[in-house]
Amino acid sequence: MVTVKSVFCGEELILETGLLAKQAHGSVTLRLGNTTILATVVAAKEPNLESDFFPLTVNYNEKYYAGGKIPGGFFKREAKPRDKEILISRIIDRPLRPLFPEGFRNEVQIIPTVLSVDTDMPTDALALIASSAALTISWIPFGGPVAAVRIGYKNGEYIINPKNSELSTSELDIIVAGSKDAILMIEGEAKEVSEEVFIGAIELAHKEMQKYIDMQNEMASLCGTQKIEQELFEFDADLVKMVTEYGRDKIESANYNPDKTKRNESMDNAFNEIEEYIKTKVEDEKLISQVKGICHSIEEEIVREAIVEKCMRPDGRALDEIRPITTMTNLIPRVHGSALFTRGQTQCLSIVTLGSEKDAQLMDDIYGKENKTFMLHYNFPPFSVGEVGRYGAPGRREIGHGNLAERSFNAVLPPKDKFPYTIRVVAEILESNGSSSMATICASTMSLLSAGVPLNASVAGIAMGLATYKDGYKILTDIQGVEDHLGDMDFKVAGTRKGITAFQLDIKLTGISAQILKEALEQAKKARYFILDKIDATIANAGEISDFAPKYKTMDVNPEKIRVLIGPGGKNIKAIIEETGSDVEIQDSGVVNIFAPDTPTLDKTIKLINSYVKDPEVGEVYDGIVKDIKDFGAFVEILPGVEGLCHISELAYKHVMNVEEVLKIGDEVKVKILDVKGGKYSLSRKALLEKPADYVEEEYNKKEKKHGKKRF
């Protein structure tokens, strides 16, 4: 067994191999305090040279036993991956993928498994380190090692590898992955931090991760790792020359078109024409199958060369130019809030629904349970790109894009005591030509304001790109689909006028420098301000809450009355909920939150709650029920368990000889409180009637009223 050690978050970090999962091609167990992660990697022995992509799969998984828990549900076992597991799988995949050799077509599967967990320690960076170590000691060709470090920021100081308890108050939560020389991946959110703070965190993280890269190299040296040369896919050199000579000009002429559909049609026609020509020169079907791949490589070179050397983008924009933007709000009836954001040929329809506390999503994992009251779901149907495709449950990409957009708003959402609604945002991508996740953020800002959500600030997002060619590079603002596909970087930045709120960096190179990121951030800031101007011109402040949204009221109740409101076994509060259909949340502090489907129901719910918790006061009017009748008056229940006396002289303006001339037991009667003494209530029906013009109170009524008997 081989073991290497370092320090992580002030604790001993151990990487070991040779004990667990020895049949895997690479197996590393990471230990940090009570956290244990087993990362395994296996690769197919033979390449699939007919594949046009590298088949890498990462399946990060958390076992419930790691946190000493039994899964919920009927089957009591782990099932499909939870969103969190998918998101961490993506965090691991993204920095590792660029470091495999170009043309490597062996299928690779990485499975990091959390075996035990310290619930105050995030596992994503650790799982990435373990996965990289497993690759590094395996026979699989890999240009690593890679390491990851999380950085927090509080009170003007950075926190290296903060724990979960520290992240709750941190202004920054950024995870940075990199190699010895460059940055490979960035992911996280912030509370409107500046670009300077952001870059400082990246530079600190890259410096800190070097020791985790060194320990992986040490482990590989101790294991005596030898990489096995694999057959890499390469295009036939003579065929490349033939396709280039005949087809480069055709591909270049098809490249420049501001319309995505027309450009794709022109490019497809060029590819097909080139393939038909090659068929007249070549009979080998395997060679012919390479033609379109070669055409695609030529297209990539043309796009990069034009951008870097001529500052020409495929759609004719300047390098820092944003596509035309149009915005609309409140275009969908009946929903609680809606907005449409269109940027070029990317279009997002965002819909907001407001709900009560019971609509919150219960998050249950190895770290415990919590209620999630803000959700943003991103949908990317195949028609958005003019294709027929799978339609159903969200895939990994949709979950990742939705999570990024959701995190963009965490810094600007109103506190629960001011806006206690559960908020669900659904982003429907209706057209896509790149940067759809950033369009989601822009559309969702407007739909949230449209729904009456008082955001602390508007949020906008922009996707920055990078094109490299020979020794040069150019940074692109607002990349479209072809620039994302053929370029080297997709750097998504979201934020307000004050600062950055969320970010995500993916690259196809073996790393980029902090200087390139600085330049990209500066351009992104200008673009963000431009888009925020467009949003503010459409809707700058929160509107009125929709008539179709639940109505909300907070009541402050004497904590001593809470038991009365709840009742034995919850009898009273259940009766209120059943009668009104409202959602009522009661806190021990006496705060009662009420959500009702409409205003009349809300008023009724408040009235019923007051019937248990409010002390009646002089002058108030109640709808009561006659409980008992005596010669001198009627006892009327005005609140549950609270009765008052309506004296016979207070039944009517006319002389009443017998109480039952006016009231009978069980009658409903509206009464007004005349007096409260020692917890006894004097009531009047007469006070709510119209007084006759010739009425004169009789003396015997005064005397009888004064000396009448009372029952309490």
UniProtKB/Swiss-Prot annotation:
Residues 550-609 form the KH domain. It is an enzyme of class 2 (transferase). InterPro entries: ExoRNase_PH_dom1, ExoRNase_PH_dom2, ExoRNase_PH_dom2_sf, KH_dom, KH_dom_type_1, KH_dom_type_1_sf, NA-bd_OB-fold, PNPase. Its cofactor is Mg(2+). Keywords: Cytoplasm, Magnesium, Metal-binding, Nucleotidyltransferase, RNA-binding, Transferase. GO terms for cellular component: cytosol. One of its GO terms (biological process) is RNA processing. It is found in: Cytoplasm. GO terms for molecular function: 3'-5'-RNA exonuclease activity; magnesium ion binding; polyribonucleotide nucleotidyltransferase activity; RNA binding. It catalyses: RNA(n+1) + phosphate = RNA(n) + a ribonucleoside 5'-diphosphate. Mg(2+) binds at D484, D490. PROSITE patterns: KH_TYPE_1, S1. Involved in mRNA degradation. Catalyzes the phosphorolysis of single-stranded polyribonucleotides processively in the 3'- to 5'-direction. Belongs to the polyribonucleotide nucleotidyltransferase family. HAMAP family: PNPase (MF_01595). NCBIfam families: polynuc_phos, PRK11824.1. This is Polyribonucleotide nucleotidyltransferase.
